[in-house]
């Protein structure tokens, strides 16, 4: 079986004043992509070996409306954002907010 690829197109909120909204939208996007990738093997090609999320390639095409030093880009690239990041207006007692997807190249 050829390696599956998930293609996602996204457009994140444009207004620089709402950097926290952009960050939350990006977090929600990554969580949905993680769920889709985890469920991938359950719904495609019955009778074949289940494809785990690590075997699915992700092509993320997005207008993040964010600068390279923004919380959005840091979250997408590194999988986490420290709670003292200027874009994050909500504090997390654990000290960081993260996703469990492998690092993505931007």
Question: Predicted regions: what is each one?
Answer:
Residues 1-106:
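Active-site regions of metal-assisted phosphoester/phosphodiester hydrolases
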């Amino acid at each position: 079986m050829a390696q599956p690829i998930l293609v996602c197109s996204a457009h994140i909120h444009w207004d620089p004043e709402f950097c926290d909204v952009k960050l939350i939208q990006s977090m929600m996007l990554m969580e949905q992509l993680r769920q889709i990738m985890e469920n991938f093997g359950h719904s495609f090609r019955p009778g074949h070996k289940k494809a785990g999320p690590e075997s699915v390639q992700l092509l993320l095409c997005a207008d993040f409306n964010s600068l390279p030093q923004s919380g959005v880009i840091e979250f997408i690239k590194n999988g986490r954002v420290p709670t003292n990041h200027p874009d994050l207006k909500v504090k997390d007692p654990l000290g960081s907010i993260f996703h469990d997807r492998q690092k993505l190249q931007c």
